[in-house]
Amino acid sequence: MKRKETYLSRDFRETVALRFPARAKELNTAFDMRLSALLAENADASKEKQYHLKWQILPGISAYETLQRVMPKEEALQTVHGYVERLARTSHKQLAALLYIPGLYRLVPGVFVKSTRSVFGPAAGFDPKELQAGNGVWRVDMMKCPYHDTCTEYGCPELCRCFCDSDDISYTGLHPKLIWHRTKTLGRGDDRCDFCMKVKK
């Protein structure tokens, strides 16, 4: 069965086709083999965690490692960061456009509460400590994160920052009456991610 392409695998293939055409076949094969091995090693992860592993974490690690065959480590990191950033900017545009609907911005903190509980909960390998959920405020301290844990486990903790930055790009400045605030992230070396999205009073 053919594996579904993710935005990371698609962008990786585009990079190698444009920049390393003579080695594109070899690099694509190396990427696919590494990703298959990573997926096999994580096959026993929960369904909830698999969502994050398959969509972003493992393709990100595979792209990062494979690109280092043809470019310096820092350039490989910035290249993968570019893939993640591009998706985040698209996501920001779509969300901001949606929030033109009058009054819709008020619902955003509540949506964050629900998505944290359903997609970013313990079953997926996260450890959220809910500090405030209601009255136009969502505040959560994330004490454990599979993005950070998996990148660290595979010897590339620096890759996690791409995903941390993605949140900031996606959610900063969505609406004049919404405040996205975060001073710490696990991926940047802190002891937690202190998430906050609130309606400006």
Task: Go through the PLM ranges and name each one.
Residues 8, 49, 99-125, 173-198:
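Unusually extended, aromatic-enriched hydrophobic runs near protein termini
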Residues 1-67:
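N-terminal, charged low-complexity regulatory/assembly segments
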Residues 3, 31, 126-130, 180:
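Generic structural motif
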Residues 55, 66-155, 159:
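Amphipathic interaction/junction segments at domain boundaries or subunit interfaces
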Residues 24, 75, 178-179:
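Secondary-structure boundary/capping signal
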Residues 136-141, 146-150, 154-201:
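C-terminal non-catalytic interaction appendages of large macromolecular assemblies
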